[in-house]
């Protein structure tokens, strides 16, 4: 198993969840597939055994049908929003994400996140958008031990799926991208700061769940970020505009785009631009990845 991932798993669960085991299924998956034929391509609904809880966890992936079975493809970890699941966004707009993944040559991984409202480790939700520090503080104070455990498991679960698929398909660790919508956008901001060395770039969509008082901005200073929002997506719109101003004034590697859509309809509007952004970042000299 990748040493970097093992350390991440131990850090998450050892600190936040006490006695829960931190063993990843990625190593077992890798060993089992050592003599297996090339893994399948196309659209796939899959599941795996999540060792910390002993549960089968679903995830969905799309692998370009043009893959030759050997090339190290770039990979996108996408985090769904509240009320959705691992399947939802890959079906939107007649499968737009799948079409773009095929066209641009990316693997797309969409995990559940342990529970539908697991939130990938980020405890913030509406109205705690950027600039609403009082709401953020109140939400953090209200997190119970059970919820803290669920948040930690959600974070670990998506990182486990990413590692599993990366190993199985030999994906390019130097071109690993992170994106998410709404609750998933909050997860993207959270994971960007937790593992800044893991990502080539990040694309949060309509979910500025970032606490100005506590977020470790210096950890993402060198990370390219493309944030998108819909002009009809209040109350997240005001938070996104405030966060965009903060990022620009701070000279971060940051781009911001607003489209004429609401909180949900903006997603298919921005996906083509997100893949174009990832392509542009990929064309730069990549950083080393663990």
Question: What are these language model-derived features?
Answer:
Residues 74, 106, 200, 223-224:
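Alpha/beta-hydrolase fold active-site loops
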Residues 6-19:
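Bacterial N-terminal signal peptides
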Residues 1-4:
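Positively charged n-region of N-terminal signal peptides that target proteins for export
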Residues 45-58, 70-170:
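Serine-hydrolase catalytic machinery in alpha/beta-hydrolase-like enzymes
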Residues 73, 91, 148-156, 193, ...:
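Soluble non-cytosolic domains of exported or imported proteins
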Residues 166-168, 173-222:
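Primarily recognizes the serine-hydrolase "nucleophile elbow" in alpha/beta-hydrolase
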């Amino acid at each position: 198993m990748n040493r970097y991932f093992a350390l991440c798993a131990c850090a998450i669960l050892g600190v936040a969840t006490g006695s829960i085991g931190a063993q990843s299924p990625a190593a077992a998956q890798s060993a089992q597939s050592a003599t297996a034929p090339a893994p399948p391509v196309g659209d796939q609904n899959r599941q795996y055994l999540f060792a910390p809880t002993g549960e089968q966890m679903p995830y969905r992936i799309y692998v370009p049908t043009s893959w030759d079975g050997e090339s190290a493809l770039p990979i996108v970890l996408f985090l769904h929003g509240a009320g959705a699941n691992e399947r939802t966004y890959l079906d939107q707009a007649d499968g737009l994400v799948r079409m773009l993944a095929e066209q641009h040559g990316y693997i797309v991984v969409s995990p559940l996140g342990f529970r539908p409202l697991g939130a990938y480790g980020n405890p913030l939700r509406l109205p705690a958008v950027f600039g609403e520090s009082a709401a953020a503080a109140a939400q953090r104070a209200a997190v119970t031990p059970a919820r803290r455990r669920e948040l930690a498991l959600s974070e670990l679960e998506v990182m486990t799926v990413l590692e599993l698929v990366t190993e199985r398909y030999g994906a390019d660790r130097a071109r690993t991208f992170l994106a998410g919508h709404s609750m998933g956008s909050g997860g993207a901001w959270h994971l960007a700061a937790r593992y800044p060395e893991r990502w080539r770039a990040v694309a949060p969509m309509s979910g500025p769940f970032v606490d100005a008082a506590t977020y470790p901005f210096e950890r993402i200073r060198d990370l390219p970020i493309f944030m998108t929002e819909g002009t009809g997506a209040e109350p997240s719109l005001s938070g996104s505009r405030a966060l965009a101003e903060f990022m620009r004034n701070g000279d971060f590697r940051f781009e911001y785009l607003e489209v004429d859509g609401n909180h949900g309809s903006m997603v298919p509007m921005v996906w083509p631009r997100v893949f174009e952004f990832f392509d542009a970042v990929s064309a730069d000299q990549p950083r080393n990845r663990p």
